[in-house]
């Protein structure tokens, strides 16, 4: 079976500059609208949205590979790193802290990307993780690497990565491309990110975790490319929503050796960035509608604890699943009083059950109330 790294022009990727520039202009137009929308927020609100988006993207980055992590732990870890006050401090989670460290290093550390830094990211992914781990952590693989697909009892080899003897040399070329300032002038940030991510996945330098690191590399390139802008768009979140297309595109491009053209890949990634910008604006709009609705609630129908908690839920100062225990702790009231408050808000349609049972039972703010009532709450 042929692979892209067998092409005689590897790794000289090519793409249609006209098409790429056209869709990139669309992205810049949308980004301008997004930046304008977020510019009206105060510093704390901007930081809160930034934390929420980062947490969403970190969880999505793992979920793309069917890896799971506790969202509340990630949100708590990011909040602490960015000095965002939390209504309830969640206990530290070593795995969430490691994933957070990698993600923040990718977007905030604009120093050149090195082999040592990538190996450090690899250690962060696996050292505190439960379950199966690759034999080698924090260094390149030393054996053949296959990408497999299971169909019932059948196992199909979808892709064979670059031979391990060539990995170190291939990675030096990739890192040189990423760190070369001339390439930043030659390619727009999304095109450059697309090239680097696909190139890395094609090499597949590690025994596991390559997809997660490829998306961290994407974040690094985008953050460096847009260093003067607010980072509110999250590529991994959009990839997760379109995961089948993502894997199909990678497979189509890497499992052949006739062409080095990656125009479709760059177009797709740019479209994901556009959708991510739109999603950020939509999330902001819903939150503002929700906050507006809360400000117009009749205080005579709710006690002070209920009003206080509703505002914390609406403006994001409390995030995650609300439990009876958390309510009692935050409001310094008895469990019985907390339960009565919560049940009252459920009856009013403001809280909805999480669907969990036993100790995991909890509640969330009803996401529909802002849409339903926000426009009439002015």
Predicted regions and their residues:
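FIC/Doc superfamily catalytic core
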Residues: 1-378
